[in-house]
């Protein structure tokens, strides 16, 4: 991806509120550049705290302007700790060289653990441990219906 690999792009900052898996973050790991992201939601499956900067925060009510069929009354969003964000941005800017190795580690971890082959291995393990046998087709044997004889009209 040209944007991710542009020489002026030094890291990815994602302040996602917890909308899902975080595929753009997973894709970005392959640039081997540092990542600053919220420490909440699906992306923490592949972003490791010792390899990325995961920001603290709290769960807060969603903004009333976004309520719809998906975001309903009582739904929560992750609100990042603004002070931690500011500190992390400054630290990344001042000490960028300290984060380069972590970005490379994160990229290698994602590449080794989040591939099609790894997914097949995990699904196979789950199926082998939980499915005793596959369903088999059996002949259908319905009882013969005894219908009343109807008179012609």
Name each model feature, range by range.
Residues 1-7:
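Short alpha-helical donor nucleotide-sugar binding micro-motif in glycosyltransferases
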Residues 10, 32, 39:
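A short alpha->beta transition loop at the rim of the catalytic pocket in nucleotide-sugar-dependent
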Residues 17:
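Aromatic "clamp/platform" in nucleotide-sugar-dependent glycosyltransferases that forms part
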Residues 20-22, 115:
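Active-site helix-initiating loop/hinge in glycosyltransferases
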Residues 22-27, 35, 42-47:
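A short, glycine- and acidic-residue-rich donor-binding loop in the catalytic cores
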Residues 79-80, 84, 94-125:
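A charged, aromatic-enriched C-terminal amphipathic alpha-helix characteristic of glycosyltransferases
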Residues 95, 116-152:
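C-terminal alpha-helical cap of glycosyltransferases
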């Amino acid at each position: 991806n040209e944007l991710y690999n542009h020489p002026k792009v030094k890291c990815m900052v994602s302040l996602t509120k917890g909308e899902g898996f975080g595929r753009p973050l997973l894709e970005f790991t392959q640039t081997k550049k540092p990542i600053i992201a919220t420490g909440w939601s699906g992306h923490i499956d592949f972003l490791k705290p010792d390899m990325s900067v995961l920001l603290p925060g709290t769960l807060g009510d969603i903004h009333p302007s976004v309520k719809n069929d998906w975001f309903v009354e009582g739904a929560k969003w992750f609100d990042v700790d603004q002070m931690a964000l500011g500190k992390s941005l400054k630290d990344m800017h001042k000490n960028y060289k300290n984060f380069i190795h972590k970005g490379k580690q994160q990229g290698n971890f994602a590449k080794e653990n989040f591939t099609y082959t790894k997914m097949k291995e995990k699904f196979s393990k789950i199926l082998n441990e939980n499915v005793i046998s596959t369903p088999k087709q059996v002949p259908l044997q319905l009882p013969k219906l005894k219908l009343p004889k109807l008179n012609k009209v």
